[in-house]
Amino acid sequence: ITDMFRLNLDLVEVSGGGGTPNTPVPPTENPNTPEPGTTTGWGFETDPFAEGWTIRDDDGDGYNWEWMDASGSNYNVYEGTHCMASASFQNSPFGGGTALNPDNWLISPAFTAGSTVTFWYAGQDPNYAAETFGVYVIANGTTSDELGHFTASNTYQQGSVDISDFAGQTVQVAFRHYDITDMFRLNLDLVEVSGGG
């Protein structure tokens, strides 16, 4: 996609992480792994990097996923006051701006896979909302094929990917903002992992 603005992604829930671009990160066990029939997740209300979320800027432009605070502003979050966001356009303080070609990865902490990962996402600018992103699982240092490809709108939608093929394994979920330029921001919020059974 091209000529949009930003895709916003908020509340992604999974734990583990750390590493450098293009280097698989061995996951570590999350004590909050969902039990069968239960859900655990992340709403990004506390520092996601302290919780083990990591980011990668594979396009190398210096712009990446950011932890956004909507307190006292009109920033678009699904719930609470925080979300994660990645830009496909960067405003200039002097007017205008720069179209970006993001290939930005947001990678969760490690967790034991259940059946499903759900998340809420939206474009920040209603006129440039069609941000695109893919969702992947990282298991044993190997990144899966894309499990789902999504296009944002100006209102939050719930996305979901089936991770039952990885059930019982220690994994991470990764959100890749890419295949887009010249929109604005992708917002991601409330990521939840459902246990199997």
Residue ranges: model-predicted function:
Residues I1-L11, A99-W105, Y178-G196:
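Extracellular carbohydrate recognition
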Residues V135-A139:
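Conserved aromatic beta-strand anchor motif in extracellular beta-sandwich/beta-rich domains
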Residues T2, N101, T112-G114, A152-Y156, ...:
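Surface-exposed coil/turn segments at beta-strand junctions on protein surfaces, enriched
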Residues G17-E35, G197:
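Ser/Thr/Gly/Pro-rich low-complexity, disordered linker/stalk segments of secreted
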Residues E35-N91:
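Extracellular glycan-recognition surfaces and repeat-rich motifs
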Residues I1-D3, F44, L106-D125, F133, ...:
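Extracellular beta-strand-rich recognition modules
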Residues N140-A167:
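Extracellular carbohydrate recognition and processing domains
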Residues R6-N8, E66-A110, D125:
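Surface-exposed, low-complexity/disordered Ser/Thr/Gly/Pro/Asn-rich loops and linkers
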